[in-house]
From Swiss-Prot:
Gene label: ppsA
Residues annotated to bind Mg(2+): 703, 727
Name used for this protein in its record: Phosphoenolpyruvate synthase
Comment field on protein domains: The N-terminal domain contains the ATP/Pi binding site, the central domain the pyrophosphate/phosphate carrier histidine, and the C-terminal domain the pyruvate binding site.
Catalysed reactions, semicolon-separated: pyruvate + ATP + H2O = phosphoenolpyruvate + AMP + phosphate + 2 H(+)
Organism: Synechocystis sp. (strain ATCC 27184 / PCC 6803 / Kazusa)
Phylogenetic lineage: Bacteria, Bacillati, Cyanobacteriota, Cyanophyceae, Synechococcales
UniProt entry tagged with the keyword Lipid metabolism: no
Location of the active site: 442, 774
InterPro entries noted in UniProt: ATP_grasp_subdomain_1, PEP-util_enz_mobile_dom, PEP_synth, PEP_util_AS, PEP_util_C, PEP_util_CS, Phosphohistidine_dom_sf, PPDK_AMP/ATP-bd
Superkingdom of source: Bacteria
Length: 818
């Protein structure tokens, strides 16, 4: 401990101490050392015994800053500078900021402050076995404002950070620059914007032992999903080298989601892994003129994840520990924004900063606000969406911060990346688009905080979008955001959840896109009645499972090349690509609604649709009528497909057994006979999905007349039914729903179809089996939903956009029925 090197300051003297060690401060000391340093001290004191590694160090106090300002007589001079400041006048702001910083830099530290810093740095050198000569121990010097990291406002990046500082003279110079950084243009603007008095804020400087992540990796993590506010997932970003590139958005990092509830139970629930380009890394400038420099990352390193699964899980565990601790200290749920680093010399992971998250934690959980784009046009750029909203205006392409005076309020900012110097104009933008950055970069954090839609990591937006052209930025269509040409029509819907009634009938949701699942988690639904695997396979996997299993036998050279590129991380085991991607997609949906039931329908492509997957034509027959051909259950046990179905089973088993998401219920589609059902269940058992084991239930789609007529027999095989009204309608009426010639006859409200539905519900209930519906009918026709409630159906699964209005209608029906 540091106490073996220096004496700890007594409580009585903390208020007037110039230096305090991290071990001496905690969350109650924000006024003394700022949010950043008090948080480091809190973690060192309270969490190291729980296995959380935090590098040690010391802080200059807020008292030291005020003492410096007072001793030098600077306060009145600074006040005079800001008497008639106009923060919206960029030239005025830049001039006043420059004069304020120069005033501080031109004024030397008092001798006793220099001595205090020198003694503390000397003690750190001694602690790490180095002498304080021309060089000493390498440290990070970071500013920490006394108003920083309060939960209501993020001052992230408002002041300066200096890495690889390794001599006393450099430490003193960096501390001086940190003091001056209290008056950077962005900090002045930010305080004004958030209503902070410039002179009520003081500055503390943290001097912390460097973690040698220049030789390894680093990143940012949040103990909450930054986009949707979903509380049960930790988001981790990672890139090579020092962490500044991730924070500033200079690099597109890898991203990982981990599910916190089952992680705490000992499972390994990595929900998603997304590879970033990681083109550059920040390293020590050994022998150079600067402290750090950026170098290119070698191609093989870019094309693999930069931390392994155990490190992902370890970081997520720490995120849980840190969040739980701060929530306990504050007496209210407190999601955290955390910076981490891996030491390349020791292989150890460290937490180097932690602060309360400042956007999602402030939002009302009782209002759902959704944006719907009504038109589409040419797509100019795509990237990661930030904030599920839509913005539009004239594009302003700004390639350098020196050009920000060209920006006008209401324009769409298009740039390479942002850092805190850009903030004075960011708050004036209707939307922000950057070439670089991930979901935790500076542009993303500030855009979220200001409620501005942003798209980051586009790659080439500054080339494909021209200054002056009208654009619409859409972040409401999932994880990928799009920049559209022109001003497009859109609608905004707001729903107050606190007044919604509860219904006896379970209201479930149909969810296909895993990227939207966290956003749907706040809807008033009792789970998922239909999670479609087709979306995941078509959009995330893209290749036919047999094309992955028999890659060397592929005859189509174009498909083979595309699959090779798609699966380059899996060159030695391409089927694992299918299992990983499918498991991640299922897990994202299951986690969003955990522990509520999530019914996952096994793949139900028709043979012509399977053929359209990469490499698929080689493995699929040409059928005259694929709608009623080789689909659903009949494929799963067929010698020509069973090994591909095994991959689906492996993915499902991983989600349930390794991730702990036992709320997943597999459902078999298009099962023509009870005997066919038994064959499929036997096939699943071969791959570890044994009915009844670990609470596993298996449902069947009730979508064929035979499912209804033989419902007693199907009840002996399956644990529940879900009526598929689309197929049941076409097969009851004997028509092809894809044919425009007979489309006018397709109607779920037909008396014959309704009798089928009635018979299915009555037979299932007589056999003690659950029965719901997941077809389109209840979403499209409120009177059909009423019909189902009157029959006593257990659950109705709806499209997300129908949930709210249908809940109200069903509540009325239930009330009328008494």
């Amino acid at each position: 401990m540091v106490s073996s090197v220096v004496e700890k300051t007594s409580v009585a003297h903390k208020e007037t101490a110039l230096i305090l060690w991290f071990e001496e401060v905690g969350t109650h000391d924000v006024g003394l050392v700022g949010g950043k340093n008090s948080s480091l001290g809190e973690m060192i004191q309270q969490l190291t015994n729980k296995g959380v590694n935090v590098p040690s160090g010391f802080a200059t106090t807020a008292y030291a800053y005020r003492y410096f300002i007072q001793e030098a007589g600077l306060e009145q001079k600074l006040r005079d500078l800001f008497t008639d400041l106009d923060v919206n006048d960029m030239a005025n702001l830049q001039e006043r900021g420059h004069l304020a910083r120069q005033l501080i830099l031109d004024t030397p530290f008092p001798q006793n402050l220099q001595t205090a810093i020198a003694e503390a740095y000397g003690a750190m050198c001694e602690r790490y076995g180095q002498k304080m000569g021309r060089t000493g121990v390498d440290v990070a010097v970071r500013s920490s404002a006394t108003a920083e990291d309060l939960p209501e406002a993020s001052f992230a990046g408002q002041q300066e950070t200096y890495l690889n500082v390794h001599s006393l003279s450099c430490v003193l110079e960096s501390c001086h620059k940190c003091f001056a950084s209290l008056f950077t243009d962005r900090a002045i603007s930010y305080r004004h914007h958030n209503g902070f008095d410039h002179f009520a804020v003081a500055l503390s400087v943290g001097v912390q032992k460097m973690v040698r992540s220049d030789l390894a990796t680093s990143g940012v993590m949040f103990s909450i999903d930054t986009e949707t506010g979903f509380k049960n997932a930790a988001l981790i970003t990672a890139a090579y080298g020092l962490g500044e590139n991730v924070v500033q958005g200079a690099v597109n990092p890898d991203e990982y989601f981990v599910f916190k509830p089952t992680l705490k139970e000992g499972f390994k629930p990595i929900l998603e892994k997304r590879l970033g380009s990681k083109a550059i890394k920040m390293v020590y400038d050994v022998g150079g003129s600067k402290l750090t420099k950026n170098v290119e990352v070698a191609e093989p390193e870019r094309e693999k994840y930069c931390i392994n699964d155990e490190e992902i899980l370890q970081l997520a565990r720490w995120a849980c520990i840190i969040e739980d601790h701060y929530s306990g200290v504050r007496g209210v749920y407190t999601p955290m924004d955390i910076e981490w680093a891996k030491d390349g010399q020791t292989g150890e992971l460290f937490i180097v900063q932690a602060r309360p998250e400042t956007v999602q934690s402030q939002k009302s959980a009782n209002v759902i606000k959704t944006y719907e784009l009504k038109d589409h046009s040419q797509v100019l750029a795509t990237g990661r969406s930030v904030g599920a909203a839509i913005g539009q205006g004239k594009a302003q392409v700004i390639r350098n911060v020196s050009q920000i005076n060209q920006f006008r309020p209401g324009e769409v900012l298009i740039t390479n990346r942002t850092d805190p110097d850009w903030e004075p104009i960011m708050k004036q933008a209707s939307a922000i688009v950057t070439n670089q950055g991930g979901k935790t970069c500076h542009a993303a954090i500030i855009a979220r905080e200001m409620g501005i839609p942003a798209i980051v990591g586009c790659g080439d937006a500054t080339d494909t979008i021209k200054t002056g052209e009208d654009v619409t930025i859409c972040c409401s269509e999932g994880d990928e955001g799009s920049v559209y040409s022109g001003i497009l029509n859109y609608e905004v819907h707001e729903t107050e959840l606190s007044n919604l009634p509860r219904t006896k009938t379970q209201i479930l949701m149909n969810v296909g896109n895993p990227e939207q699942a966290f956003g749907f988690a706040s809807y008033p639904a009792d789970g998922v009645g239909l999670a479609r695997l087709e979306f995941i396979i078509a959009n995330h996997i893209k290749a036919h499972p047999l094309a992955l299993m028999k890659f060397d036998e592929l005859e189509d050279p174009l498909a083979k090349a595309e699959i090779a590129e798609l699966t380059k991380l899996y060159a030695g085991d391409r089927p694992r690509f299918f299992v990983d991607k499918l498991a991640h997609g299922i897990a994202m949906i299951a986690a969003a609604f955990y522990p509520k039931p999530v019914v996952v329908r096994m793949s139900d492509f028709k043979s012509n649709e399977y053929a359209n997957l990469l490499g698929g034509r080689q493995f699929e027959p040409k059928e005259e009528n694929p709608m009623i051909g080789w689909r659903g259950a009949s494929r799963y046990y067929d010698p020509n497909y069973r090994e591909a179905y095994a991959l689906e089973c492996q993915a499902l088993k991983r989600v349930r057994d390794e991730m702990g998401l036992t709320n997943v219920i597999p459902m078999i589609p298009f099962c023509r006979t009870p005997d066919e059902g038994r064959k499929v269940i036997a096939e699943m058992a071969k791959h570890g999905l044994k009915q009844g084991k670990n609470g596993l239930e298996i449902y069947v789609m009730c979508e064929l007349p035979s499912n209804v007529i033989l419902a007693d027999e199907f009840s002996e095989v399956f644990d529940g039914f879900s009526i598929g009204s689309n197929d049941l309608t076409q097969l009851t009426l004997g028509l092809d729903r894809d044919s425009s010639l007979v489309a006018h006859l397709f109607d779920e409200r037909n008396l014959g179809v309704k009798r089928m539905v009635k018979m299915a519900i009555e037979t299932a209930k007589a056999n003690g089996r659950k029965i719901g519906i997941c077809g389109q009918a209840p979403s499209d026709y409120p009177e059909f939903a009423e019909f189902l409630v009157e029959l006593g159906i257990d659950s109705i699964s709806l499209n997300p956009d129908s949930v709210l209005k249908t809940v109200l209608r069903i509540a009325e029906v239930e009330k009328a029925l008494g």
